[in-house]
Amino acid sequence: MKVSATAFAVLLMAAALCAPASASPYASDTTPCCFAYISRPLPRTHVQEYFYTSSKCSMAAVVFITRKNRQVCANPEKKWVREYINALELS
């Protein structure tokens, strides 16, 4: 019994560490915050809209919302992120 509980705890920790860079709620507030950025550009055709995270968040981020309604965190200082934002503003 102890072995299965330990194995479950290890799997739970591994799942938490392997989570993609996505937005998640900050404490009890519904403002999404990011704790990691996506490492490579998203396909531009997958992005529908975006928003900036709140100043309450520990790190600034742009959250892109994909066609499949996924929220993906990106570094607002990256060139591709700024280009996507400009393209979305013009469309």
Swiss-Prot record:
Transmembrane segments: none annotated. GO terms for cellular component: cytoplasm; extracellular space. One of its GO terms (molecular function) is protein kinase activity. Disulfide bonds join C33-C57, C34-C73. Pfam families: IL8. This is C-C motif chemokine 5. It comes from the Eukaryota. InterPro entries: Chemokine_b/g/d, Chemokine_CC_CS, Chemokine_IL8-like_dom, Interleukin_8-like_sf. Belongs to the intercrine beta (chemokine CC) family. It is found in: Secreted.
